[in-house]
Amino acid sequence: MGVHTGDSITVAPAMTLTDKEYQRMRDAALRIIREIGVDTGGSNIQFGVNPDTGELVVIEMNPRVSRSSALASKATGFPIAKIAAKLAIGYTLDEITNDITGVTKASFEPTIDYVVVKIPRFAFQKFKGADPTLTTQMKSVGEAMAIGRTFKESLQKAIRSLELELNGLASRVGLDRGIPEGFDRQGAMERIRQQLRSPIAERIWYVADAIRLGMSNDELFALTKIDAWFLDQLRDLMRVEQRLVEQASGQGSLDDALLWEAKELGFSDERIAQLTGLAAASIRAQRSAPGSTRSVTYKRVDTCAAEFEAHTPYLYSTYGTECEARPTAREKVIILGGGPNRIGQGIEFDYCCVHAAMALREEGLETIMVNCNPETVSTDYDTSDRLYFEPLTEEDVLNIIQRENPLGVVLQFGGQTPLKLAIPLSKAGVPILGTSPDAIDRAEDRERFRDLLNRLGLQQAESGIARSVDEAVSIAANISYPVMVRPSYVLGGRAMQIVYDQAGLLEYMGSAVKASHKHPVLIDKYLSDAIEVDADAICDGRRVVVAGIMEHIEEAGVHSGDSACSLPPYSLDETVVEEIRRQMTALALELGVVGLMNAQFAVKDKTVYVLEVNPRGSRTVPFVSKAIGVPLAKLAMKTMIGRSLDDLGFVTAPKPVHLSVKEAVFPFNKFPGVDVLLGPEMKSTGEVMGIDADFGWAFAKSQAGAGAMLPMSGMAFISVKETDRPAALQVSKQLHRLGFGIQATSGTAGYLRDHGLEVKTVLKVTEGRPHIVDLIKNGEVALVVNTVGTAASHADSLSIRREALNKGLAYYTTMRGARAAVMGIEAILKKELTIRSLQEYNCRR
């Protein structure tokens, strides 16, 4: 209790309730639904149970489907929302047939003979200063789910599904290979106790370490209030870990009996290798040896605990002797999904996976989906012909490939998760459909990418690759500050930063990353005041169609996933747009792209610089597809199985006569104290879209969709860095013409006043009261425009941005964003709103 449902590790079926408690809850739930008056549809009810007395309390009731409903649907195979929709139009439960059994009715309550574990995924590293304590405010950004025969197996599968570079309950204090000589047991135990006192995302790993160091169940329960049953399960896993360590160190190998015991408990090959010092490949070879009596097997989710046969192949892995996979003899393709949602990799990629599955069905091929995210459409049992609810690791994917023997595997739709498997799968002889792993590496590897651009005669900002701090200092000095720094091979701009001087670079190199030959740091000249552009293309290996070119509304330096963007570009010259189209075509053909490709460019003084190229589906594919009315992911999938764009009838992209604006949605209200200032590290968790024939209206709609309604009147507060003052003057003049009053801090106010604008000077927070934050709190400000330059100004203006967020004000931290906001306000005040469906817009192109 006290931790939001979405942030809790969840287990089904309930493991620690008595049958009497379960029946009381079931009866209470039915009485509540009838009392509230829910005649049809789904409802969610949360209870609290006192484990000592059995006292039952109702926490809340939602007369609708909820996040828990989605999880329950995936856990049981019982599609709650689908059935609720049928009930709403007049069906009764006994009239709806269960899709999975094809025999039973929806009135037959689902029963499961396996264990499901859901673990949330967090992104605290993205939000400097955020409190990592888990409370009643949900803070997770995604989740992974696993299915196994036991809680232990399911828990370990769920942990590796999170993609945290952890293979299991890895020690946080260096105890994976036992307690080392000279280890400070007392100091480590105190650190662990400190971590256990409050609920945090990593708590379960610290519980494992506490068990390794001998902490009793009584003390663990006193610190965590985790039920003793779960503590005993974790203790059993730690005992097996210890036996693995001892046997491997004693005889240099593992007996088959212990290996199979570990595999049945959900230990991955990598985790066993980590514990024993043996190679993961040798462990795989041992368990795959000819004549072995046991192997990885697959069971079906059937909603009825095997009482009836399941006709829908919804599968999970375990270790045993009887396999229910029953692969068909049809030609088939495996699609790897994106895993748990996270910042930088969300449902945009799931959209691509689902459309790929649709395309394969249209082409008569059997579709196999592999994913572990219960929030997605790709893990619906009827999206693909066969669904494997499994972690997206090399081991788990190879096991499925070995069982199914597909024509090939699709990696380019699930984001970075499946792309990381390109090389190991290729080495294992697995056919990769679409763009080759070598082409992906040419685009990802900075030195090979530079050679590619030189070969094509394309421009790139000056850059260098540092493998040490000294190299970084030397490269940055040669390029000249400001520079953009980031680790190689990342998605979502993780640990990416703009640094303005050597001191900032040294701080970054010391805290954000550890540079090495295996993990170099990329340093690029930061193109200040440049316009960033995103472009998506589709290629069949011979023809390239540039489907969409998007102009970012925020300037270069704000992560592409966080910037609003417009399709088509709203301010770029047509000559620049054509040059970007030419460069996209050259890049796709040189890389040998088959399928989708995304590239990002910076435009400065009409010169186009290539920032990066991603020969895969990008997060902008759904936006572009809806903006132009073409299912790009579907077409791309068809090119990957040999169809040409000419054959598919897609040889040029439509030119829409309307404008589409994508705006990012941020979780800042979940993290009090976190700065809302945008930069090269991605922070958004979703996006919305506005469409209109007029850019101003399209932008205004996108802001409303993101929950930031543009004001129609009132006072606008302007405080900008010195280089932004000319742009701020133009914005202020436009706002003044629209009837807004202007407030500004002393420096900005003086500049505006010197250029003939009437402006009221307000105090900074450090200059006395009433200051600007007081005015925002008192409701005297309607719009905030705040840009910063130095680190000191970042800190000085943090409270302004935070209070604007708290009050729900429209706020802009770039001048291009502010200019777009003014265009939106002007459209609302002076231009007529037209309402059309998406289909109508796409028919008018």
Regions inferred by a protein language model and the residue ranges of each:
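Short, basic interhelical loop/turn and adjoining N-cap
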Residues: 223-232, 274-285
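Conserved A3 ("GATE") glycine/threonine-rich loop of ANL adenylate-forming enzymes
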Residues: 444-447, 490-494
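ATP-binding N-terminal substructure of ATP-dependent carboxylate-amine bond-forming enzymes
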Residues: 157-158, 285-294, 299-458, 467-474, ...
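ATP-dependent carboxylate activation and anion-phosphoryl transfer catalytic cores
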Residues: 1-247, 251-258, 265-266, 290-295, ...
